[in-house]
A protein has these predicted regions:
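SAM/dcSAM-binding transferase cores
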Residues: 618-750
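Short, solvent-exposed mixed-charge patches
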Residues: 515, 771-772
Length: 772
């Protein structure tokens, strides 16, 4: 249903514009090409220049314009440019057409056959030309050949050329899908990653077209040149996986400790060395086919339109079949081998003739084809990489999906689910930490009956809501975008040495797990939830930024019950203060109150939850008496026990995790921009900003910088005056200060600053026990 909706949306919003854009090239060719023998050269040149412009547009749109202007203004700019092109075309149409240039071949004197007829430019001229030719043929003796068909290749050859035209579009777009998936295994997968691959492919196609324009000037047989191009492209494709493995050290993540620009240059260099040879050579095939069309051409526009149509249909089918069938069924390397095989078969089918040169060319194609089929084994190439620092990690099972590669790995820390080699969705070794993402909001709001989880991952967090300790929970709905993640979780997380880590998520009648885009589900459903719990999302990954936008927060707010709350988990070890402040500012803009809660107190690995509250909400009161448990937890302890403290966790002591009221301290975030669908600041700025720090001083908002931010918030709005805590006792309101002191003690302890650690410990004990 989701796919059908997307196809419908694309068809209605993009098809009309793309249909009209498809007319440009044939019409321009009809205007510019006045000589039959110049058709291949000029049309290839036009195609190359047009594609070079596309590469420039992709670079600007992929790297700069959305951040500078926003999507809407970028679209307006594109419309203005299109109108400018239309105006220029209209002005050109007012000028007289250039005079027809006759064929460059030396004409036979006074013979009708030797003259190359002028190329018609209008429908009336074409019809007149056809009537004249028909009249000439009727007057010509039967044994005299026609001027148009005398040098034409046989019909079978024409069909092979059209098939190669189709394959050119099919192969290049299918390969672009494969190349993108290939690099998703070793790159951070931000919007810039995909823009880089697209720009490199477009530049190579443009250069290939310009090379083709030069080849069209040669006197060599076009079919022989085509065969050699296809053969060279297939050879480059065969080498691509091995070059990729060499440059990425067997698929390890490509990273740089330098600046943003140095990292982008590293990506461009790695991607160009890997795919540019294949893309450049294969990019010459389609424009060079225009050279072979010269013998058949009656009208430049008609021929260009025919070739472009066949090539584009192939491109559409290549992207669709590769994305939805080949990757799922064959995987990256086998799919690349099949596409290489198709190119080699096409080269063998081209009608070269039976002279020695042609036979040698065919023999070489056959040898390369056999080597590709039998000597090279794609199964020997790795599909994902493991953590080089965890040498004991081993891969248990892999699923190659259309949009990512999902793997289950096992190591000393437990069983993990990963996406694209390096992005971990969770592990049995982090069971308690993941479960806390459900426990914490349910301890704050113990009367919760219904929850929605945006993201499933291992299933531990969503399943945590079904724990018997949360006796009021009646409904849990969880959405996961990647179906293979659900498969992995069902298979490996429900029976971990006999223990169901998901808490019965896949068989409890209260739970529903959907393979669906969580954001789209919240926009479309009419269901209401007491808690909408959004998982951790890496902010710089492509698509993740949309889960931090104002529009998403607004649609989530609409799905809350009158007393419901929205919970957004944030990995501070992947956020700079800039990104955190943008997200905080955006949530403050949507929700009446926004509070911040710690997930843990481990310096360097901090996670927080931002909870969006609706108007008039306060935290519910708690009548649990935890006094004895609190005293027992610290009895006889000192700063050396910081890492071993077992503090009680219940609805009373949960305020220990409270970081403060962000709405009351909104002055700290007012200078930061909003993150919106139109201006996706997080998605485009996060990959840049975190590379501004040096290698020995990470820019993440963890440790002391985060503790300092909490101190600022609690200074502006002390817990004793916090409107969200009015239902809590005076002593209980001191718990947030105890949490801040405890976190500070952990930070100073890691620095081995004994005096500062002791001071923070003393402050923690005072606030924890509510004694002065």
């Amino acid at each position: 249903m989701a796919l059908a909706h997307q196809v419908r949306s694309l068809a209605t919003t993009r098809f009309p514009a793309r249909l009209l854009h498809g007319w440009h090239h044939p019409v321009m060719g009809q205007f510019m090409i006045r000589d039959r023998e110049a058709f291949g050269r000029i049309s290839a040149m036009m195609y190359g220049i047009n594609t070079l412009g596309a590469a420039l547009g992709a670079a600007l749109a992929g790297f700069y314009l959305p951040l500078w202007l926003g999507f809407n203004a970028t679209c307006v700019l594109a419309i203005v440019l299109s109108l400018a092109v239309a105006l220029a075309a209209f002005k050109l149409s007012l000028r007289p057409l250039p005079k027809t240039i006759q064929s460059n071949a030396s004409p036979e004197p006074k013979t009708e056959i030797a003259e190359a007829p002028p190329l018609p430019t209008t429908r009336q001229e074409r019809r007149a030309q056809e009537r004249l030719e028909k009249s000439r043929q009727e007057k010509r003796p039967q044994n005299e050949p026609s001027s148009i068909t005398s040098d034409s290749p046989p019909t079978a050859g024409r069909k092979a050329i059209m098939a190669l035209c189709f394959l050119s579009g099919f192969g290049v777009l299918a390969l672009e899908v494969l190349w993108t998936r290939m690099f998703s295994q070793v790159l951070e997968n931000s919007v810039y990653t995909f823009a880089t691959i697209l720009v490199i492919v477009l530049v190579c196609l443009a250069l290939g077209a310009l090379v083709s324009s030069g080849l069209a000037r040669l006197k060599a047989s076009p079919l022989v040149v085509l065969t050699l191009l296809v053969l060279a492209g297939a050879g480059a494709l065969i080498a691509t996986p091995h070059v990729f493995m060499y440059l990425t050290d067997e698929m390890q993540i490509v990273t740089s400790t330098g600046s943003w620009s140095s990292y982008i240059l590293l990506i461009f260099r790695t991607a160009a060395l890997t795919i540019a040879p294949s893309a450049l050579i294969l990019g010459t095939i389609f424009p060079y086919l225009m050279k072979t069309e010269e013998a058949h051409m009656k009208s430049p526009g008609q021929s260009l339109g025919r070739l472009a149509t066949i090539n584009t249909i192939g491109a559409i089918l290549g992207a669709l079949l590769c994305g939805f069938l080949l990757l799922d069924g064959l995987g990256i390397w086998r799919s690349m081998q099949i596409i290489t095989l198709l190119y080699l078969v096409a080269a063998l089918c081209l009608p070269l003739g039976w002279n020695l040169r042609s036979l040698v060319t065919k023999a070489v194609c056959l040898v390369v084809l056999l080597v590709n089929m039998f000597a090279l084994d794609p199964a020997s190439l790795p599909i994902i990489s493991t953590d080089p620092l965890a040498r004991e990690e081993k891969v248990i099972e892999i699923w190659e999906a259309s949009d990512c590669t999902v793997a289950v790995t096992e190591s000393q820390v437990g069983t993990s689910i990963k996406i694209n080699s390096h992005y971990s969705l969770g592990s049995t070794g982090a069971y308690m930490q993941e479960k806390l993402q459900a426990d914490l909001p349910l301890m704050i709001y113990p009367e919760t009956e219904s929850l929605f989880f945006l993201g499933v991952g291992t299933g531990i967090s969503a399943g945590g809501a079904l724990d018997p300790s949360h006796k009021n929970v009646k409904k849990v709905v969880a959405c996961e975008l990647v179906p293979e993640v659900i498969t992995a979780s069902k298979k490996y997380m429900t029976d971990f040495h006999g223990f169901d880590c998901t808490g019965g998520l896949f068989n409890d009648p209260r739970a529903t797990v959907l393979v669906e885009d969580g954001r789209h589900y919240l926009m479309a459903t009419n269901e209401k939830f007491d808690i909408v719990n959004a998982d951790l999302f890496v902010p710089f990954r492509s698509g993740a930024g949309s889960l931090y936008t104002k529009e998403h927060f607004e649609s989530s707010k609409k799905r809350l019950t009158p007393d419901g709350v929205f919970v957004q988990w944030l990995p501070l070890y992947q956020l700079t203060e800039n990104e955190f402040s943008i997200i905080a500012r955006t949530m403050i803009e949507v929700f009446d109150q926004v509070s911040m809660w710690r997930h843990n107190f481990q310096p360097g690995d901090e996670i927080v939850a931002l909870i969006g509250h609706q108007k008039g909400q306060t935290l519910p009161a708690s009548d649990i008496d935890s006094w004895a448990d609190k005293l027992y937890a610290i009895s006889g302890k000192d700063p050396s026990d910081l890492m071993r403290l077992n503090l009680p966790l219940d609805p009373q002591t949960i305020l220990f995790f409270y970081g403060g009221n962000l709405t009351a301290a909104r002055e700290l975030f007012e200078d930061y921009p909003l993150n919106t669908d139109d201006r996706p600041v997080i998605e485009y700025q996060a990959p840049r900003s975190y590379r501004k720090g040096s290698s020995d001083q990470p820019p993440w908002l963890v440790g002391a910088p985060f503790a300092n931010l909490v101190d600022k918030i609690q200074t502006i709005c002390p817990p004793s005056d916090d409107p969200l805590l009015v239902n809590r006792s005076t002593d209980n309101r001191r718990m947030p200060l105890a949490g801040s002191a405890f976190h500070r003690a952990r930070i100073e302890s890691l620095k081995e600053n004994t005096e500062a650690t002791q001071k923070a410990w003393t402050e923690f004990v005072k606030e924890w026990t509510a004694t002065d």
